[in-house]
Each structure stands twice: as structure tokens, then as C-alpha cells.
Amino acid sequence: MKKIVTFLFILMIILLAATVLLHVRSCGEDLFQKTDITEKLPPIDDSLKIRIDTFLYNNFPQGSIGIELYDITADKEVYSYNKDSLMIPASCMKLLTCVTALRYIGAEKLIHNRLYTSGDIMGDTLNGNVILKTQYDTAFNRDTLNNLVNELKNKGVTYIKGNVIVDMMLTEPLDHEEHWIIGDLRTRYMGLNLQGLPRMKKEMLGALQAKGIKIIDGTITIGKLNPRNATLIADNTATLHTLVEKSLKVSSNINAETLLMPLGYIYDKKGNYRENGKKVLQNFIRNEMNINPTTVCNIDDGCGLCINDKLTADFLVKLLVYSAKRPRIYNEIINGMPLSGVDGTLYKRMHDSRLKGKLRGKTGTLTRNGGVSTLAGYFIGKDNHLIAYAILNNGWYVETSREWQDKLCLKAFMPQRIMGELKDTTHIIQE
């Protein structure tokens, strides 16, 4: 009898354990099902792909084309055509330069133009040197220089018994790259500090003479600031934000190319800043985006003037997605980009009320190689989703390509309803 009772007791324990195990397993399966991330992602707009396909079927362009759209909100590609082909990006190359500069330097970085003295001021005579130290402020002009020198005059200095030392980041003029066309870089818009030492020496002498200051027992020469033996008397500042905004909004080649200098300085303080800056762009792609740069780009400059520059539509979109996940970068990029039909290089385009103010885009234009027209940026799609897009037209007339892009954006990108305007940064996607 005792054996039967013992057997029944053991059997009950086994059945109870089995029941508990099945319950736990069931709960576990339910738990994993509920935490499946794919179920939490909002659906994409399937009609967007249909609209683009329909538009391309009826309006397929000449030349070569690369297109990609990515729903950042849903974290999913919406559409692509020829997205992995290397194509000439023109000024869309500036997106890579600006994002890299914002990542490694920051929009708030101050750019200094400073005037120092060494030695003592006795009456109206400075017994020592004046040192002008400039960085990469593209807006450094005669007014800036005169304001700095005026502070020397305010100290009561009429005579400099010593040298005027110019400490410049770039002693040679910011010149054309090998594959640019002469005139592409509009030197009349350059800062004085980018026009080389001879020009700076001439302007410095003129600024001193305008204030009635004379150099005795000395000359204007190149040299390096020794901060331990110098006193700061004047400081004019700009920010990296200004360079980024001008590069994007009005597509300034000088500002974009100048951004390579501080990047190159980070890479090697004694090397060629522009060449080293291009190496930093490649390192950014490799280290920050985890992409092999040789598969998605060829970088010959920082502004996109060179026809040897190459990017893929897929890379441009990945760059935009990278930016959207980083608020400090995204704020600068989204606000720096022209707004359709409103400002910048899109001021004269996309005036249809269904498109005006609805899209942000960096434009790119080259008249060489049969024509290059590119457009990449953001718009708000169905259900308030943030969409990143890239369109690259190569080998087709520029004006015709622009008209085609505008129609694509209007008839395919825009849903049937009028979309919300993309004027602010409320659609930041947190990383």
C-alpha cells in the first residue's frame, strides 16, 4: 500500500512539473512575440513606390539616373533604382563634407582672427612685434582687418619698432584643383586669409597706413605666434555654422572647400590640409558609417566641382539617415538645406503650391559631361513619416533634368493630400 501511495505522489509531482513547464514555455513564447521589434515599426507608404514606378514608366529620363528613398520613421527602404552605381554628385558632395565637419568639429566651433602684440608700449611707440593670426574664416575681409588694426590704434600706437608677423593657416592661395575649370572658384569672394601671404602682407600694410601707423626698424613677414610672449588686443570670431550654412544654402564652393582645412588640421597639423581633409572624409565613411569608401565614392575635392567625384544614391541616403539620427548634426543640415520654392538654390524651383515649402534639398549642378543635376534631402510623407531621398541625373541637359526632378517630386513624392511643411526640426529621429 505504501508503494502505491509513493508512486501516485511521484506521478502527481511529475504532472505538476510538466504543467508548470508548459505554462512557462507558453509565456516565454508570448513574451518574445510581444517584444518583436518588427511589429512596432510603422508601415511604409506602399503607394509611394507605385507612384514613382508609374512616373518613371511614363517619363523615363535620358542619360544615367540613380534614385533611392528611405523611410527613416519606419527604418525601411521605400524605393530604389540603380542605387549602387557610382555617379557624379556635383554639389551634393558638400553634404559629405558638411556632415563630416559637424561630426568631428561641431557647428559651434569658433574661428578666430586675432591681433597680438609682444613687448611694451611706451608713449606712441610699440617696442616689439605685432602678430596677426588668422584661421579659416572665409568672410575675413578688409573691414575685419581694419577693425583689428583699429584696436592697435586705440592703444595709442603710432609707431611699431619691430616686425609685423603674419601667422596664416594657408600661406599659399586657395587654388583650383587639378580637374577644375579655371573660374570655377570665384576668388573675388574669398577671404583675404585664403588669398596667400603676398596679398595678406599688402592688405596689412594698407590697414596700418589707413590708421596712420608706421613700421620702423622692421618689416611685414611670415612667422608663428608664441602665445607665451604675446598679449591679445583684438579678437574677431566666426563659427563653423556659417561655413556649413553657406555651403548648403547657396552652394558656396569656397566655404565647402575651406571646411577641408580644419579637418585636415585634425589629421596632421603639418601636412597639406586640403589633401588630409579628403582623407578624413574617407575615414568618416569607414569609421562612422561602417562602409568601405572604395565601394561608394571617389573623393577629389570637398565641394563637388570635380567630375572625378563619384557617389552612389544609396550612400547619399545613408548619409542623410546617419544625420537624421543625430540631432546636433540634423539641425544644421535640415536648416541649412534650401526649402523648395522658398530660398537658396531652390528659390527659383518648385513653386507649385503642392510642393512649395514641402521639401528640403541640396542641389548639385555641372554643365560638363553632358550635364549633371542632382538633388538629395528630406520630405515628410504619408502619416508624417520622415523620408530621405537622393536623385542623380548624369548625361542630360541641366535645365531638362531640373524640370524632370521637380515633376518627380510633385507627382510621385507628394501624396495626394497637401503635406505638412518641413520648416523646423521636429522630425528628428533619436538614435
Language model segments and positions:
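Soluble periplasmic/extracytoplasmic beta-strand elements of cell-envelope proteins
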Residues: 66-70, 80, 97, 129-133, ...
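N-terminal Sec-pathway targeting helices
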Residues: 1-13, 19-21
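A small/polar active-site loop signature that marks catalytic segments
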Residues: 159-160, 170, 182-336
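Extracytoplasmic
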Residues: 62-64, 82-84, 90-93, 108-110, ...
